[in-house]
Amino acid sequence: LAVISALATALACYPRLSLWLNRSAPVWYLEGTVFLCGIVLWGFVFAWHTPYTRRPVFLLKLELGPFVTATVAAIIASAVFDLVLDPLLRSRIPQDYPDDLEHWFAFLLFSLALTQLFLLFAPFDWLMRLLKNRWAATNLTVLFGALVLAMRIQSLPTQLPPLLFAALLTVRIVMGFLAVSFYLRGGILLIWWWTFLFEARHLLNLNE
């Protein structure tokens, strides 16, 4: 199952990797790397999520409460980014914002297939297996996401203003805790729904 999921992840990442003009390696190499890493990451999820959380990985029948909460939270987060953070970030990190529908779809698939797997599903389930403590696993997963974001920002050619950096980090931490909660209550499908709604905010600003 992990191999099949890793293959699906690699295929879903192809559009964005192929559109990445300044990539440091050929697409086939990046695809192979995603596939091999995906096997390991999905292995964490399928091997340890259900035994240590007592929750299914895929919850096909979502409960109304978590679904409504995730929907409202995604809409609020989208509004905060679209009205406050995106206008400040778009000029500084243009490569993170899609210009047209093709790029938006590629960004969406990449986020659904790999970003959530790398930042949420796999680290949380690995930490649950390692620590056997939901509180510790949640906090360390959120911390990991915050560190990745901080490293990403520090690698930019032009540094963000401290206030903007602090605001972005704070919002991401809050969203990290919400994401873990939704993952536990609704599984991967609820996180994918939350991600779709959040990424859909870009549709309002496409050139085409």
Summary of predicted features, one role per range:
Residues L1-F46, W104:
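Alpha-helical transmembrane segments in multi-pass membrane proteins
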